[in-house]
Amino acid sequence: MSTETLELIKNSIKSVPDYPKAGIMFRDVTSLMEDPKAYQATIQLLVEKYKQGGFTKIVGTEARGFLFGAPLALELGVGFVPVRKPGKLPRPTIAQTYDLEYGTDTLEIHTDAIVEGDKVLVVDDLLATGGTIEATVKLIRQLGGDVQHAAFVINLPEIGGETRLEGLGLNVYSICEFPGH
């Protein structure tokens, strides 16, 4: 990726201090999508990275993972599978609960969305602790999917999510990094 492209993408991501709580610097990818050149460059970088990967499904996590995973799936000519909060998917699902900083959360996937042997790429907007993606990977593997790659627009390396996901056997790719939380 060229320095110019990286700067275009990085500069389009607005940083919002003290959101959602004091001491957090929120990295807002919705501002990236407001800039069609930056959004297109982001999707094209992902396409170039994964076009030879042989994936059969792209899985995106609620909600911002949909915004990058679905266009990537279209470009690669493969199916897109959403992983959502409980009660949002109409067909039979399986669920995975995971720990948050203060409490727990749960994700669900349709039981027929992944079939044995599907080669899956997981996509989300931001990697922090890795908890959401770990839960997503567990769901995919429970359904027989082969998931070895996870892609992000942003990585916050100081939080340690990349190390956590590598511990699950994932190859982790992020377009850009930001310091802090």
Curated annotation (Swiss-Prot):
Pathway of action: Purine metabolism; AMP biosynthesis via salvage pathway; AMP from adenine: step 1/1
Annotated catalysed reactions: AMP + diphosphate = 5-phospho-alpha-D-ribose 1-diphosphate + adenine
Any Gene Ontology CC annotation: cytoplasm
Keyword flag Glycosyltransferase: yes
GO molecular-function terms, A-Z: adenine binding; adenine phosphoribosyltransferase activity; AMP binding
Organism domain of life: Bacteria
Record's keyword terms, sorted: Cytoplasm, Glycosyltransferase, Purine salvage, Transferase
Location in or out of the cell: Cytoplasm
Biological process according to GO: adenine salvage; AMP salvage; purine ribonucleoside salvage
Keyword Glycosyltransferase: yes
EC number: 2.4.2.7
InterPro entries cross-referenced by the UniProt entry: Ade_phspho_trans, PRibTrfase_dom, PRTase-like, UPRTase/APRTase
Protein's job: Catalyzes a salvage reaction resulting in the formation of AMP, that is energically less costly than de novo synthesis.
Family: Belongs to the purine/pyrimidine phosphoribosyltransferase family.
Record HAMAP family: Aden_phosphoribosyltr
Subunit structure: Homodimer.
Protein name (database record): Adenine phosphoribosyltransferase
Organism: Aliivibrio salmonicida (strain LFI1238) (Vibrio salmonicida (strain LFI1238))
